[in-house]
């Protein structure tokens, strides 16, 4: 199945705080990042299929060691997106991710990030967040968050369900 001339794009909103090194109990100021796919994507399923699993490399261009405080996936067309998973890309997997996304349209990735082998993908690119219809943003409690290194990048896997294209 094919979505008729509908290119899809999504936005990832992230709030990051500088990593505290002085042990202060005061919550540091956050920086907000909005990251989008390099190019819009026209989902297509393999022959006789109804689903397209696609991964995209996202670079929030973080310039300092940080803590992820909030993260939110916002699809343009929710009726086509079954779920999305946001993965951390390790330094070891980054060259492969860059190569697979060289034209900015992502790569097929059923069952994980598509980086490394199928089984190592779950270990080498751990989940940071996920989204499904009805889910809002992830908000860490005060004083908590997910460490994020300077220059680190995300892969997001988007599962497009193309049955929605017909109705």
Where are each of the predicted segments found?
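Generic low-polarity alpha-helical segments
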Residues: 1, 21-24
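Hydrophobic alpha-helical membrane context
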Residues: 16-17, 95
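Beta-strand-centric surfaces of beta-sandwich/beta-rich domains
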Residues: 23-167
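Bacterial N-terminal signal peptides
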Residues: 8-15
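Bacterial N-terminal signal peptides that target proteins for export
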Residues: 1-7
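Cleavable N-terminal signal peptides
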Residues: 10, 20-21
């Amino acid at each position: 199945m094919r979505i008729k001339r509908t290119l899809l794009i999504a936005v990832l909103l992230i709030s990051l705080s500088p990593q505290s090194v002085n042990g202060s109990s005061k919550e540091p100021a956050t920086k907000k990042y909005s990251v989008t796919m390099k190019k819009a994507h026209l989902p297509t399923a393999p022959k006789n299929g109804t689903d397209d699993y696609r991964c995209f490399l996202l670079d929030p261009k973080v310039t300092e060691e940080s803590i992820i405080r909030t993260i939110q996936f916002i699809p343009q067309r929710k009726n086509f997106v079954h779920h999305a998973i946001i993965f951390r890309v390790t330094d070891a997997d980054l060259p492969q991710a860059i190569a697979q996304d060289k034209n900015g349209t992502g790569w097929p990735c059923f069952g994980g990030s598509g980086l490394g082998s199928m089984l190592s993908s779950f270990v080498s690119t751990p989940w940071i967040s996920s989204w499904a219809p009805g889910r809002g943003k992830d908000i860490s409690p005060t004083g908590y968050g997910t460490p994020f290194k300077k220059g680190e990048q995300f892969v997001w896997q988007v599962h497009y369900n193309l049955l929605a294209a017909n109705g």
